[in-house]
Amino acid sequence: MEPRLPIGAQPLAMVAGLEMKGPLREPCVLTLARRNGQYELIIQLHGKEQHVQDIIPINSHFRCVQEAEETLLIDIASNSGCKIRVQGDWTRERHFEIPDEERCLKFLSEVLEAQEAQSQLLVPEQKDSSSWYQKLDTMDKPAYSGLLGFEDNFSSLDLDKKMNTQNPRSGSHREPPPPPSSSTRMLSREKEASNKEQPKVTNTMRKLFVPNTQTGQREGLIKHILTKREKEYVNIQSFRFFVGTWNVNGQSPDSSLEPWLDCDPNPPDIYCIGFQELDLSTEAFFYFESVKEQEWSLAVERGLPSKAKYRKVQLVRLVGMMLLIFARKDQCQYIRDVATETTGTGIMGKMGNKGGVAVRFVFHNTTFCIVNSHLAAHVEEFERRNQDYKDICARMTFSVPNQTVPQVNIMKHDVVIWLGDLNYRLCMPDASEVKSLINKNELHKLLKFDQLNIQRTQKKAFADFNEGEINFVPTYKYDSKTDRWDSSGKCRVPAWCDRILWRGINVNQLHYRSHMELKTSDHKPVSALFHIGVKVVDERRYRKVFEDIVRIMDRMENDFLPSLELSRREFFFENVKFRQLQKEKFQISNNGQVPCHFSFIPKLNDSQYCKPWLRAEPFEGYLEPNETLDISLDVYVSKDSVTILNSGEDKIEDILVLHLDRGKDYFLTIGGNYLPSCFGTSLEALCRMKRPIREVPVTKLIDLEEDSYLEKEKSLLQMVPLDEGTSERPLQVPKEIWLLVDHLFKYACHQEDLFQTPGMQEELQQIIDCLDTSIPETIPGNNHSVAEALLIFLEALPEPVICYELYQRCLDSAHDPRICKQVISQLPRCHRNVFRYLMAFLRELLKFSDYNNINTNMIATLFSSLLLRPPPNLMTRQTPNDRQHAIQFLLVFLLGNEED
């Protein structure tokens, strides 16, 4: 069917279809054409008796959109046909069906390009009173702000003074996306992930209706506003949550768990069960699987109420900490976006004997985060427990499955439940006095001395959490298999170590209790039963709110452009040091008339928006009109960036690009000065420094690193001795390693839990500064801090003690001690000296294992990850078998004699 076009019309694109007039379908051809510099849509109908031609000018009032699928949030079956709507200045809205979807989408893409080209040529037009656009414009305008959930009223603005950005979308009939969960409200930069079942958006759809750079932002903004108006479409429905915690002291289950898990007449909807000290064996630190995990998981499943059917939602374990989530089968369909995370707070975060595990999920439309933690032990270590809590909060973040969204931290959830062996004790040294008050049931007097209550009151830990009234006796410490208090020589003071806390609204605790019937461990299990109000979406009301938002956004997007104001654009970070955080803050304000989306974007040819030592928090988000947001610029030099800063290859200099969608870019200048550190400096360079690194000129540091690299290469090739050609003989080992090891040898051989207890952060920074600026007679800080400083030093080395070139040979020779020693003999001299020096020191430490509580397996596992690291290109491909060979390689020298 060859259409006849008006004289002078140049066809650009064409598609055949049907015009829908109620139940009738009439064949037609839609043609995009250009005539006399004006783009037009020509509609030609082919009925039985007539040939009708309509011409619709493509101007600022023209709309041509796809029905239903224009939501951008649903997918379309391949080549299934599509429907479009067309409306112009003088025409009613007309509906067409195009059987060939590919041709339709291509045609719509051409129309969109024509609209954009035409908008560049248009001058303000005199609006005709008969135009549908004019009729819309002269209606009483609602306050956009109220409809979108914002406080500002835009109705008084002079719209003619605003630049128009043509928006070809019309969204009043869109299908709404799944309701956003409220993480978006709590952290505006998070684009909440949708249900796994939800189809994805096609690239073709995105190109048709929104410029590529704006598609995701529009979707995100719609979700953001939906969240703000959440109260309009959700009902609060109560569900029963059972939360339990038990430190099982490495024991296996020896009785039914029903007295703990099935103690309420009505079965709960959700179970959250946490264990600590699940497995105390040395192997638990090094292997992913544990027999105890299987035993206790099965015991929990058998202990759940038989009145209801449950399904395991998630299990997560880190060494001895395990968290299980179960839900009634009829509720599982309402749980989505499940994610797990673990955080070790043992030394350097490598030893997971202490720390936390967590599960986050969305139940209906409420976000939950369940945390199970085991904090530092001993009465006097309450500050370390506080630090463990802060570390878990700071380091534990979740990535929502199958979505590229910013990570969500613990506190960005509607409801957080924190359970576990928190290990806070009573500030009462007299066990007999405590037991006397317990026998008199005067628990309220004891609770005044409870460390957790004291720390919460002082806002040093768990400040924003609630805890129910404790009316049960302390749950620690008992003789195993009995109800008797600890009768060992240590005679531990009873304490409420095992706790359950929560934060969030609509949370009502019904019971908080211990379960004395279970005697497996030296702790008693604890449980709490909650009624939690969960946001359940009313689909009809939700659809109405969604359509309302989209309709108003379509009008607003043509009327306003976004704008930001920054409080400052230049930043200088003075005296930046290794592992010492510096922060600078500034404010951004939305001084425009519409909500806006901002983000830091990579510069040309860069993959990240900033250098590795810099971070902006938040790095993206939404701002409402007149809203102000604080942004923190954080500079932190870690082991990953310290070497290139030490060598002068990089400087504290960067430029950040703050991008405003549909607006302009803002440029932030970052500057500063860095103080070099011995941490992250090569062993060769350190052996050539007789003075502290801060006293060495920067130019000399660069020369030392370059010379050291060349000589190390020669040494590996065994061409020349390491010190040949130098005027000054280098040190046998770096003075920094000698100072740390010598201190530990003199003062820490009898230190309990050496290399297993983290150091204090303030002391670690003092040690780093001390080694960088002086050659001290004594190292500041306690033994644990000095021990961790040694580990940090080894981890930060740009080339590990056993060079990357010999990594694979070490693994291959792990079965043969003779070959292992040959490989070590091929190391460059200073690397070989450091390795032998450390092995001699560790063998000496192992002689005092009865006092310091260390063993060869633990030491081999910890130090093999530092001394025998895989090359960067193999890091992600390291297998458990590789790690086992590395441990075996080190055991050859730990179990050998002093001559080794």
From Swiss-Prot:
Signal sequence, start to end: none
What segments bear the compositional bias annotation Basic and acidic residues?
187-199
Keyword Lipid metabolism annotated: yes
Pfam families per record: Exo_endo_phos2 (PF22669), OCRL-like_ASH (PF21310), OCRL_clath_bd (PF16726), RhoGAP (PF00620)
Q: What class of enzyme is it?
A: hydrolase
Q: Region labeled Disordered — which residues?
A: 160-201
Q: Which UniProt keywords apply?
A: Cell projection, Cilium, Cilium biogenesis/degradation, Coated pit, Cytoplasmic vesicle, Endosome, Golgi apparatus, Hydrolase, Lipid metabolism, Membrane
- Family matches, as SMART domains: IPPc, RhoGAP
According to the record, the residues making up region (5-phosphatase) are: 236-562
Give the record's GO CC terms. centriolar satellite; ciliary basal body; clathrin-coated pit; clathrin-coated vesicle; cytosol; early endosome; early endosome membrane; Golgi apparatus
The UniProt record lists the keyword Transmembrane: no
| Positions of short motif Clathrin box 1 | 73-77
Q: Which reaction does it catalyse?
A: a 1,2-diacyl-sn-glycero-3-phospho-(1D-myo-inositol-4,5-bisphosphate) + H2O = a 1,2-diacyl-sn-glycero-3-phospho-(1D-myo-inositol 4-phosphate) + phosphate; a 1,2-diacyl-sn-glycero-3-phospho-(1D-myo-inositol-3,4,5-trisphosphate) + H2O = a 1,2-diacyl-sn-glycero-3-phospho-(1D-myo-inositol-3,4-bisphosphate) + phosphate; 1D-myo-inositol 1,3,4,5-tetrakisphosphate + H2O = 1D-myo-inositol 1,3,4-trisphosphate + phosphate; 1D-myo-inositol 1,4,5-trisphosphate + H2O = 1D-myo-inositol 1,4-bisphosphate + phosphate
Single GO BP term: cilium assembly
In which residues does the motif Clathrin box 2 occur? 701-705
- Using the record's annotation, list all stretches that form the Rho-GAP domain: 720-900
> What InterPro entries has UniProt attached to this entry?
Endo/exonu/phosph_ase_sf, Ig-like_fold, IP5, IPPc, OCRL-1_2_ASH, OCRL1/INPP5B_INPP5c, OCRL1_PH, OCRL_clath-bd
Residue spans making up a coiled coil are none
Q: What is known of its domains?
A: The ASH (ASPM-SPD2-Hydin) and RhoGAP (Rho GTPase activating) domains form a single folding module. The ASH domain has an immunoglobulin-like fold, the Rho-GAP domain lacks the catalytic arginine and is catalytically inactive. The ASH-RhoGAP module regulates the majority of the protein-protein interactions currently described. The ASH domain mediates association with membrane-targeting Rab GTPases. The Rho-GAP domain interacts with the endocytic adapter APPL1, which is then displaced by PHETA1 and PHETA2 as endosomes mature.
Family membership, please give it.
Belongs to the inositol 1,4,5-trisphosphate 5-phosphatase type II family.
Q: How does it assemble?
A: Interacts with APPL1, PHETA1/SES1 and PHETA2/SES2; APPL1-binding and PHETA1-binding are mutually exclusive. Interacts with clathrin heavy chain. Interacts with several Rab GTPases (in their GTP-bound forms), at least RAB1B, RAB5A, RAB6A, RAB8A, RAB31 and RAB35; these interactions may play a dual role in targeting OCRL to the specific membranes and stimulating the phosphatase activitye. Interaction with RAB8A modulates OCRL recruitment to cilia. Interacts with RAB31. Interacts with INPP5F.
What is the designated name of this protein?
A: Inositol polyphosphate 5-phosphatase OCRL
